[in-house]
Amino acid sequence: FQDAILAEGIRIYMPTTQEWNAEQQQQLKEVSIEDLLPRDEISIDMESVVAMLHGKRILITGSAGSIGSEMVRQIAKYCPAELILIDSAETPQHDIRLMMAKQFPEIKAETIVTTICSKSRMEHIFKTYMPDYVFHAAAYKHVPMMENNPCESIQNNVYGTKILADLAVKYGVKKFVMISTDKAVNPTNVMGCSKRICEIYVQSLNKAVKEGIVKGETQFVTTRFGNVLVKKSIDAFVL
């Protein structure tokens, strides 16, 4: 019901419990996403974002997922030279392709259906498109599923991340942003463990590059996401 209301552009208001009484029922307060966050709103330096993304070649893995698809929409607003979008799910990737053609026809976008675990395919993509920045959002994320399929969790999340990180250094990517999860904090399940291993690997690789042990200039950054609030095509991230 709430999704249907929001889809029609109807705004929802909610009073606090202290205000909700017979005398103050008309004193309503608008509810925003920020009201749900247990922290202060983060201020973003938009000039730096524009300078980073404008006219650059951006590779996004997991581009058809809940986080990856919203990254595609947000990054496309800043006029990158090209988006290289990778996902193994054919149907949602096709939806992303149609969305880009409709909403951002001026942006060159390559929608590629493949797995990040194919080293030869990933190397071909890096060699062909030479991305400036990589946003790595591809991962198996459902905890119960990964408990029952631990080998696939390690294969996709860990091995796939290693392939991408190594290729980023090899092909001169400026910055590699890995999307992780709050479940990597003192992990108690297979999925969380797999993402923590990924964090340790890219952190170690970043240190090795800085110290000259590994030749390259790539900077590695990890960001942890908590829950994702999804309202149809509108995703709001809870960091």
Where are these predicted regions, by residue range?
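Short beta-strand element of Class I
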Residues: 81-84
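Helix N-cap at the beta1-alpha1 junction of Rossmann-like dinucleotide-binding domains, i.e.
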Residues: 87-92, 116
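N-terminal Rossmann NAD(P)H-binding glycine-rich loop of SDR-like oxidoreductase domains
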Residues: 57-78
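Flexible, Lys/Arg-rich cytosolic regulatory linkers and terminal tails that connect or flank
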Residues: 2-57, 169
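Conserved Rossmann-fold cofactor-binding substructure of NAD(P)-dependent oxidoreductases
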Residues: 110-133
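Conserved Rossmann-fold NAD(P)-dependent oxidoreductase catalytic core, especially the SDR/UDP-sugar
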Residues: 8, 23, 130, 136, ...
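Conserved beta-loop-beta element that borders a ligand/cofactor-binding pocket
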Residues: 203-234
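Glycine/proline-rich active-site loop of Rossmann-fold NAD(P)-dependent oxidoreductases
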Residues: 190, 196, 229-237
